[in-house]
Amino acid sequence: MQKIKVLCVDDSALIRSLMTEIINGQPDMTVVATAPDPLVARELIKQHNPDVLTLDVEMPRMDGLDFLEKLMRLRPMPVVMVSSLTERGNEITLRALELGAVDFVTKPKVGIRDGMLDYSEKLADKIRAAARARVRQSAPVQHAAAHAAHAPVGAAPLFNNPLLSTEKLIIVGASTGGTEAIREVLVPLPPDAPAVLIAQHMPPGFTKSFAQRLNGLCRITVKEAEHGERVLPGHAYIAPGHAHLLLARSGANYIAHLSDEPPVNRHRPSVDVLFRSAAQHAGKNAVGVILTGMGRDGAAGLLDMKKAGAYTLAQDEASCIVFGMPREAIALGAADEIASLPEMSRRVMARLSSMGDRVQRV
């Protein structure tokens, strides 16, 4: 078996050593070289032709983002960003994902062995996913206003008939590559779109920054979900990185419920948990969407939604960074429709428009 060749770039010798120990402890990957900064990394890439690059976000001599932007333009390759848990680190990491990084992982905690096994498994999974990922060159980030301004003259709006009922919902799940996929789904949505609930595999600390970033790009309001808050049209609610997000009911209203129950499919938040709660409480009033990601989280839950009467969509292979979760959902027969990412918003809103303003009681 040919091992995945990894190049680790970090200005800390201790972190480079720890990352090397973790990666070399896996049976299917090996560190071919390490670099203290991007300038050294540039030469090592030429020498070793690695399959995956792990890249520190903040480094001397050349900023990690500057290096990533040049790399994705001149020699695109799978990159996993390594980030500190700071507000600045969160913002830089999200920008790195926009520039074409496949995924990110937080820095290992030096000298703390508790949780190291779990960290090692997560790092290895992300490297495996990156090695199989479709690398894309960075594209300009489009704001909602720009999206509307560039619509063809006379083109039909995404959503012709405003939904007067709060009963309709859009339920979304994603993992690797999902931050950019979610952005592409949300930005075109009109202000009167139904509420959107989102489970994206992401560690604590990043989901709030992710929501704030999307809120600045979208015509709907995007926020990190809070326990017990009412789910409203024109809003998107992102599961916090430390909790499962579930849909619940209080009378005629939908409510966001957060749970600290153990991880499901090794994830918290879990897409399956969100989808199953939507199947139970929204039924045929929901549209379920499963986007790019590694593994099978969400596949069974999407099938539950379909069985409950929801319309379900899966992202197609060609537009996925990692065609894992959608593949599993399609294999289960959970997807009513397979759509490319650029068409996903239009397909979702077309389906909701066909549902009209009729309130369908579960």
From Swiss-Prot:
SMART domains: REC (SM00448). Keywords: Chemotaxis, Cytoplasm, Hydrolase, Phosphoprotein. GO terms for molecular function: phosphorelay response regulator activity; protein-glutamate methylesterase activity; protein-glutamine glutaminase activity. Residues 5-122 form the Response regulatory domain. Involved in chemotaxis. Part of a chemotaxis signal transduction system that modulates chemotaxis in response to various stimuli. Catalyzes the demethylation of specific methylglutamate residues introduced into the chemoreceptors (methyl-accepting chemotaxis proteins or MCP) by CheR. Also mediates the irreversible deamidation of specific glutamine residues to glutamic acid. The active site is at 175, 201, 297. Its EC number is 3.1.1.61, 3.5.1.44. This is Protein-glutamate methylesterase/protein-glutamine glutaminase. It catalyses: [protein]-L-glutamate 5-O-methyl ester + H2O = L-glutamyl-[protein] + methanol + H(+); L-glutaminyl-[protein] + H2O = L-glutamyl-[protein] + NH4(+). Gene3D superfamilies: 3.40.50.2300, Methylesterase CheB, C-terminal domain. The keyword S-adenosyl-L-methionine does not apply. Pfam families: CheB_methylest, Response_reg. The gene is cheB. The modification 4-aspartylphosphate is found at residue 56.
